[in-house]
Amino acid sequence: GQEEVARTAHSLAGMEPGLDSERPAGPWMALRASAYELPFSDESFDCVILSEVLEHLHEDRRALAEIGRVLKPGGPLALSVPREGPEAVCWALSHEYRNSPGGHVRIYRRRKLERMINESGYEVFASHFAHALHTPFWWLKCLVGPSREGFIPVELYHKLLVWDLMKRPWITRLAEDLLN
């Protein structure tokens, strides 16, 4: 978890635009910040993780440039975005999903994303797929309406995902690996 990372890292900063307040806690802190104007000095991070963020940003290239400003030369950028196929199904299933404020503003195609990353000054050295078991959850959510609460199949699937994340049983790990 976050505490484990914080114990091994010299310092850790997490940012969230919707955060109510800043929460410093030992060697890590949570900040409310914009990806376009990060509140850090040039070259202040050894590594940056941008997980499931880029697809929410209207100016993705601007955000990548800003990350390049705070990242030390040669430092890695770990980036993840939703897979094109499953995301396209979500968009097809739900007008609400694809038009919700703060939601996903684009679907990335792998080659186009890699080209943009390279053009932004980074080098793609590895890629893989993950979260295959989460895809049916989002399809269910989109079928019934992403903001609808109390739909039993969605709630049960969510419980399965939480159980899987916490327990990591071999059967779901195998299914995830095969489906990815």
Predicted regions mapped to residue ranges:
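A C-terminal cap/extension of S-adenosyl-L-methionine-dependent methyltransferases
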Residues: 92, 125, 130-180
